[in-house]
A protein has these predicted regions:
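Hot-dog-fold acyl-thioester-processing enzymes
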Residues: 1-61
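HotDog/MaoC-like acyl-thioester-processing domains
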Residues: 71-76, 80-123
């Protein structure tokens, strides 16, 4: 996770909270340094899971998003995904719905984000 990526994403999404890009401001907080924007963490960890879980699928939504630990510039993030449920689509013949839980972990194996995601895939 690079500092430049975090600042770029934060400003691109018009998030003006200085905790994400102002080191002097962040030094006065409990974290002492800028936090990576949580929506960037969500996007990154979702992206890390696409190749294994949903490369040819369509996202239907996220739920139960939790952020149990902060992410900082310099952290190395990886993703783990488990399938929670699968079923045939009731409205789209030939498609299935898969529900997964994905966790993002840092280099210390601390969970930094966890969420459930529903994906529609062609059968």
């Amino acid at each position: 996770m690079l500092e430049a990526d975090n600042v770029w994403f934060t400003l691109l999404t018009m998030n003006t909270n200085p905790i994400h890009f102002d080191a002097e401001y962040a030094a006065g907080t409990e974290w002492k340094k800028p936090l990576v924007d949580s929506t960037f963490t969500l996007a990154l960890v979702t992206g890390l899971s696409v190749q294994d879980v949903s490369e040819h699928g369509v996202n239907l939504g996220w739920k139960e998003v939790r952020l149990p630990a902060p992410v900082f510039a310099g952290d190395t993030i990886r993703a783990e995904t488990e399938v929670l449920a699968k079923r045939e689509s009731q409205s789209r013949p030939g498609f299935g719905i898969v529900t997964v839980r994905t966790r993002g972990l840092n280099q210390r194996d601390e969970v930094v984000i966890e969420f459930e995601r529903s994906i529609m895939l062609e059968l």
